[in-house]
């Protein structure tokens, strides 16, 4: 698995990680066992970065269970997502618990109360509980504010959507990330599945085989990662075998 530096501090990440939105919001032993199998497959292929959030229901808890016994092999990314200071502390406490005591990449989710949240994340970084701070947003209407945060010098990376149907980041976010040396984590590489609805035929994919591409999902991941300004992509899946294919 190729690895790239996420931001100016040179923290290395795999070019393909895994998101947990929706797919890891599960309960019950059978569903949790499936999630563990998916995580183990990702670790075995080197796709050892897992992105979550308190916003994703049970995902942080389920991910933590799945990493039991292999936490040292993983890079955990999560977020804080609230305008309430007390709730933010409870979220952070729960996230650290589920992540076995530390979180490598901690993000302000959708820029909610970002000045105060960055203050707290910087404290956690100083305490050695996190490595790199980031910020996320899914909506192009918020990218101007995201760019303000990028220029603040307080974050090392951003997480934004990027796929053939969502290309707003090309206009200003990616150029600014390149200028500032910030990492870029790609959410929604498959457009929440919309880009996958029309699968090309094997004949159409054949020209991509020399590049290691045999599926449409692989082609979409390569599409985003072929831009050197993009550091990694985090597809989500609820199906065993998919992470092996994606990696």
Each language-model region and where it sits:
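N-terminal binding-site loop/beta-alpha segment at the start of enzyme catalytic domains
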Residues: 1-74
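Short, acidic/polar
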Residues: 28-42, 84-100, 116-117, 140-149, ...
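Active-site mouth loops of central-metabolism enzymes
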Residues: 21-33, 77-87, 110, 136, ...
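Acidic-and-aromatic substrate-binding clefts and catalytic sites of carbohydrate-active enzymes
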Residues: 26-30, 53-61, 81-88, 109-116, ...
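Acidic (Asp/Glu)-rich catalytic clusters
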Residues: 7-12, 44, 63-73, 92-101, ...
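Conserved, mostly hydrophobic/aromatic
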Residues: 6, 18, 42, 50, ...
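Beta/alpha (TIM)-barrel catalytic core signal, keyed to glycine-rich beta->alpha loops juxtaposed to Asp/Glu
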Residues: 3, 109-247
